[in-house]
Amino acid sequence: LTAKLGYPITDDLDIYTRLGGMVWRADTKAHNNVTGESEKNHDTGVSPVFAGGVEWAITPEIATRLEYQWTNNIGDANTIGTRPDNGLLSLGVSYRFGQGEAAPVVAPAPAPAPEVQTKHFTLKSDVLFNFNKATLKPEGQAALDQLYSQLSNLDPKDGSVVVLGYTDRIGSDAYNQGLSERRAQSVVDYLISKGIPADKISARGMGESNPVTGNTCDNVKQRAALIDCLAPDRRVEIEVKGI
């Protein structure tokens, strides 16, 4: 019984040593010329075993080795008449079971990128502002307070807010563009004062683009009635993008 200790020289070549012991039994038979009888003796014992060699892996399963083994003091000179040492030089082939190619390691699939969700809120400009004005009314501030309570869960590291201001078609394009920008900025300034990070919110004026009334007010001529008819176009839309 021996223990094998190996050291790799290359991927395919190892040197090794084996250390242990061997249980042996030695038998002798001698002929007595005087009596004409044969004498038989035997002895048993344990002797140390030392071995060293090189092993070359031809394949993962098959290897060849060259080894020298030495066993010390086999037998008892008083019992069997001799106590030799034993040396053995051997060349052999070994087969290792279960050494097939390892299954390729499959890297885990990367986690999917977090889905960016966009939420939309629409506020009536007539609630936020007086007609043709960009200063928030008390009712408008109350409406934004309610909106902020919904936005307060937004993580500023992972989201952004865009405020879009819209006007109706009454007035020139340039005037309406400027009014929509001022109204959007008023909403942004108020939400920043409530706690939305300034670098996570922006204002954009859309002028009289994208009217929601379509052509439903084309036949309305009286100004007051037209203002009422176009009220849905006067709005502030808020886009919240967050993960």
Swiss-Prot record:
Residues 107-114 are annotated as: 4 X 2 AA tandem repeats of A-P. It is found in: Cell outer membrane. Keywords: Cell outer membrane, Conjugation, Disulfide bond, Ion transport, Membrane, Porin, Repeat, Transmembrane, Transmembrane beta strand, Transport. One of its GO terms (cellular component) is cell outer membrane. Sequence repeats lie at residues 107-108, 109-110, 111-112, 113-114. Gene3D superfamilies: 2.40.160.20, OmpA-like domain (3.30.1330.60). Disulfide bonds join 217-229. With TolR probably plays a role in maintaining the position of the peptidoglycan cell wall in the periplasm. Acts as a porin with low permeability that allows slow penetration of small solutes; an internal gate slows down solute passage. Required for conjugation with F-type plasmids; probably serves as the mating receptor on recipient cells. This is Outer membrane protein A. It comes from Escherichia fergusonii.
